[in-house]
């Protein structure tokens, strides 16, 4: 039987994992020659053309069997661009955490989550686009231009450029990828504490051997994406009714 959660995470409540973003959005013409980090050629051209603010957006969590898709949108301050920005997957956890705090302290940041229920209802593509669009809409400032990773951009009320591999090329997108990755990892660590039998804090919901064994032993929990084939295959007679769950140690 699957263990009963000790206490389900409440992402809507104030959480130290999500420090309040600070900083002012850049203004047109604010670009300087002293920018550091990834290639700012694209942003520099946009600011020089008077299209400000420029936002970057990215998501994390399309592939896992459990947990939300987390999307982030970031408007970097050209005068305070963090050094060392890169694709979040290329950074160590310690470096991501350090950059995350710096981004939140110096940039405008917004986050949106597409939970498993929305993923199952709408499909992963539509849920991801929904999260990206909501992250952009949640920015304190309305961007004039959006740079987004990939080739499938969301519908938003500004001009958009999709860049394949953008999280490793464009600083604004890299910053968004770091924010999304850190937020999702922290959320999944909380889910792991509530559902210790699944090891979410180690595999973050991805389809690892450990996760597959836990699914086979316990069936899906409420954080699993039931429309995903490996989870769907475990639902036939394996998932206990709500009153049958046992208390976790």
From Swiss-Prot:
GO terms for biological process: DNA replication, removal of RNA primer; mismatch repair. Residues 52-240 form the RNase H type-2 domain. Residues 1-19 have a biased composition (Pro residues). It comes from the Bacteria. The keyword Iron-sulfur does not apply. The keyword Manganese applies. Manganese or magnesium. Binds 1 divalent metal ion per monomer in the absence of substrate. May bind a second metal ion after substrate binding. It is found in: Cytoplasm. One of its GO terms (cellular component) is cytoplasm. Its cofactor is Mn(2+); Mg(2+). A divalent metal cation binds at residues 58-59, 149. Keywords: Cytoplasm, Endonuclease, Hydrolase, Manganese, Metal-binding, Nuclease. Its EC number is 3.1.26.4. InterPro entries: RNase_HII, RNase_HII/HIII, RNase_HII/HIII_dom, RNaseH-like_sf, RNaseH_sf. It catalyses: Endonucleolytic cleavage to 5'-phosphomonoester. GO terms for molecular function: manganese ion binding; RNA binding; RNA-DNA hybrid ribonuclease activity. It is an enzyme of class 3 (hydrolase). Residues 1-31 are annotated as: Disordered. Belongs to the RNase HII family. Endonuclease that specifically degrades the RNA of RNA-DNA hybrids. NCBIfam families: PRK00015.1-3. This is Ribonuclease HII. The gene is rnhB.
């Amino acid at each position: 039987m699957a263990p009963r959660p000790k206490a389900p995470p409440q992402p809507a409540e104030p959480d130290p994992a999500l420090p309040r973003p600070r900083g002012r959005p850049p203004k047109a013409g604010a670009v300087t020659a002293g920018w550091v980090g990834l290639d700012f050629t694209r942003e520099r051209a946009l600011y020089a053309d008077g299209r400000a603010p420029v936002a970057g957006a990215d998501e994390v969590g399309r592939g896992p069997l459990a947990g939300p898709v987390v999307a982030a949108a970031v408007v970097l301050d050209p005068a305070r661009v963090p050094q060392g920005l890169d694709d979040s997957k290329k950074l160590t956890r310690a470096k991501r955490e350090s950059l995350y705090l710096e981004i939140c302290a110096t940039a405008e940041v917004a986050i949106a989550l597409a939970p498993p229920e929305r993923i199952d209802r709408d499909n992963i593509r539509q849920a991801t686009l929904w999260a990206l669009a909501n992250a952009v809409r949640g920015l304190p400032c309305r961007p004039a231009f959006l740079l987004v990773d990939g080739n499938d951009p969301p519908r938003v009320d500004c001009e958009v450029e999709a860049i394949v591999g953008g999280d490793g090329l464009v600083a604004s997108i890299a910053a968004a990828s770091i924010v999304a990755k850190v937020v999702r990892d922290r959320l999944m660590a909380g889910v792991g504490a509530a559902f210790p039998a699944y090891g979410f804090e180690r595999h973050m919901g991805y389809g690892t051997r450990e996760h597959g064994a836990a699914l086979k032993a316990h069936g899906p929990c409420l954080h699993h994406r039931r429309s995903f084939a490996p989870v769907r295959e475990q639902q036939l007679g394996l998932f206990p009714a709500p009153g049958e769950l046992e208390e976790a140690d």
